[in-house]
Amino acid sequence: GDGRVVEGHDPVTGAVRWSYSRDTDLCGVSWVYRFAVAVFSDDRGCGQASTLDGSTGQRGPARSSYSDRRVELSSDGTTVLSAGDTRLELWRSDMVRMLSYGEIDARVKPSSKGLHTGCRLASAAASSSAVSVLEACGRQADLRLTLLRPAKEEDEPDQHNVAEPGIGADSGAKILAVSETRTAVYLPAPQPRVDVIDETGTTVGSTLLPEPPLTTNVVTRSSNLITWWTGHRVMVFDTANLTYRYAIGPAGSSAPVGPATLLAGKLMVPVTDGIAVCDPVNGVGEDFLPVHRAPGDVPVIPLATGAQLLEQRGKTLVALGPG
């Protein structure tokens, strides 16, 4: 999607199968099950969401609500998280809101936060049953981690706050992934690391990093694996419990240039001059596929659809194949 238009392409030929446009700007595109989820702006922010069948472009469920002027969309395949600087929402595939948190323009309940009264949401991620967010609140110097779970009322989620002493609002700390009961979070101090925190706020695992990640770092979810490209290497975690498995780093003049995806039972890792084909169990390289890419500084994000391997390079989607 770009501008005011969302297009569906044939994954093999690249031909446009369908397009959908609105008379307002597109804020972002995500996905859930077989649907693309397109979010457009209106006078209440980026809150106009439409689902579109990925094969035909036929419209499905839609929703509208208050939102920030800029949002980041993410999905675990069954739910969609829309997160801005002051508000987030978790949507089911039918676009019913499961959970909302943060500021709202029209307060209905005393517990609701009016505009300019809440915290800045520095980073957020979700699973189908939980949301975790790093917040910068008031004059507090440190971020806090807030663990959210859907409750009887979608705008009154269960909350558990975890202090993160020494982690400033602009430190680069980031929620990497959320499972049913755990959260993986990158924390830069006192030493760069990934902590895994359970629903009680207890740290149940910690992995040190040899260097801080780049600001362009990217997380992807593929089947039973979560991969995080730090800008230097790809770190791999289990989806279910977020246990750290292994890392794939530079080898000679070749280094990872993006996160990984699974295709035909193999872990496909974009590297400087091609694709490293690795064993998903231990990360050991098994094969190499040369790929010519124009020089660039954007992450290369691989995607698998059926037997087709795609790469997202900035705003360009490239289908890889023989030839």
PLM region descriptions:
Residues 9-10, 50-53, 90-93, 146-150, ...:
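Hydrophobic/aromatic beta-strand positions that recur at structurally equivalent sites within the blades
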Residues 208-217, 221-292:
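Intrinsically disordered, low-complexity segments enriched in Gly and acidic/Ser/Thr residues
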Residues 102-239:
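Acidic, serine/threonine- and glycine-rich low-complexity intrinsically disordered segments
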Residues 283, 291-294, 306, 311-323:
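N-terminal export/targeting signals for secretion/compartment entry
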Residues 22-35, 64-78, 108-124, 163-180, ...:
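Repeated scaffold domains used in trafficking and secretory/extracellular systems
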